[in-house]
């Protein structure tokens, strides 16, 4: 996943490129030991204290940056997100490069494009392709292909044994991470309808999504009536969160 790419592969690349270890600042905000740095201003103070020599280049690696975004900041679009101000301040320093990871449903592409005003670039981390999945699976090719089609290419799937465990992992991931994050970010109160919408879309993979037809599907199946504008908004949220394309 993204944490491994940041703290292992990229970290090792920096060392191999001759960057001193003291010039690489790593902070995993999901680690309880770093809980204090979820306050953006304390995070800024810690980093600037580590950047001692203006003549040297420093690399700041922050994992799970969404932990430094408050719930009220997330819910209220008019509330300034302090973390973004901190990151912009770091980016203004000529000798500091910043690399961050974040939950895709909280740390949005639109934020990168608007808040960092040309200072930020995105790197999308996709699930494994089958050419990556197959050799790591240790299965016969036909069995690996069957599992890949059914369960997808999230790396953690390879660590789960048995279909029940894989299905449980995916269900928990969807409900506890994607769905919860989107509801918090966009102030969605009707979590059940969003979950049903996700199931409707999943049942028609590869088909064009028509908000009016989806609304009619809700109505005909005896679910809650959801208007076409609401469906359109929900689809937009799902796209921004990289749940659908």
Question: Whereabouts are the PLM-identified features?
Answer:
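Short glycine-rich substrate-engagement loop in P-loop NTPases that contacts/grips substrate
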Residues: 25-56, 81
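Amphipathic alpha-helical segments of the small helical/lid subdomains adjacent to P-loop NTPase cores
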Residues: 122-160
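Structural recognition of the conserved hydrophobic beta-strand(s) that form the central parallel beta-sheet
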Residues: 61-62, 89, 97-103, 124
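Conserved Walker B catalytic segment
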Residues: 66-99
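Post-Walker A helix-loop "phosphate-sensing" segment adjacent to the P-loop in P-loop NTPases
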Residues: 11-23
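Hydrophobic positions on the alpha1 helix immediately C-terminal to the Walker A/P-loop
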Residues: 5-9
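Accessory nucleic acid-recognition modules appended to NTPase machines
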Residues: 163, 167-245
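Short regulatory helix/loop adjacent to the ATP-binding pocket of P-loop NTPases
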Residues: 105-121, 136-138
